[in-house]
């Protein structure tokens, strides 16, 4: 379990580097100037919340990302939670990135296609593009 915890943090850093590379190559849908992690209070849930990646272009536009380093495929709940947490902010234009070690469930893929403003990236595809 300790290796997975360690690799989770390493994977987050890989995802951030991937987004910077996407930005520099003009392939990122959000032209952000800052990128980092966010921790804060969720008044609806009355508890702490975290977002692995928050990248801001301006006061209206941002990218929200979640990074999952697990042996299970990232499911619909991961995307739904990210969307819910993004609603703590007042950005009008949002794009979501989900990164996963082993890919995504069918439900997650289908919802991402319906939403249009979601990019899914698994580790293998990311490494091929870097």
Language-model segments: residues:
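A cross-kingdom feature that marks ATP-driven nucleic-acid transaction machinery
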Residues: 1-130
């Amino acid at each position: 379990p300790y290796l997975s915890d360690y690799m989770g943090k390493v994977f987050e850093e890989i995802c951030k580097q991937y987004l910077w590379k996407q930005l520099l190559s003009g392939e990122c849908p959000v032209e952000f100037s800052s990128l980092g992690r966010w921790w804060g209070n969720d008044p609806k849930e009355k508890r702490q919340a975290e977002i692995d990646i928050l990248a801001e272009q301006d006061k209206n536009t941002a990218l929200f990302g979640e990074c999952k380093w697990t042996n299970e495929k990232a499911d619909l709940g991961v995307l739904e939670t990210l969307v819910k947490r993004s609603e703590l902010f007042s950005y009008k234009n949002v794009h979501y990135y989900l990164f996963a070690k082993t890919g995504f469930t069918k439900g997650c893929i289908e919802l991402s296609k319906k939403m249009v403003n979601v990019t899914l990236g698994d580790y293998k595809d990311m490494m091929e593009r870097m």
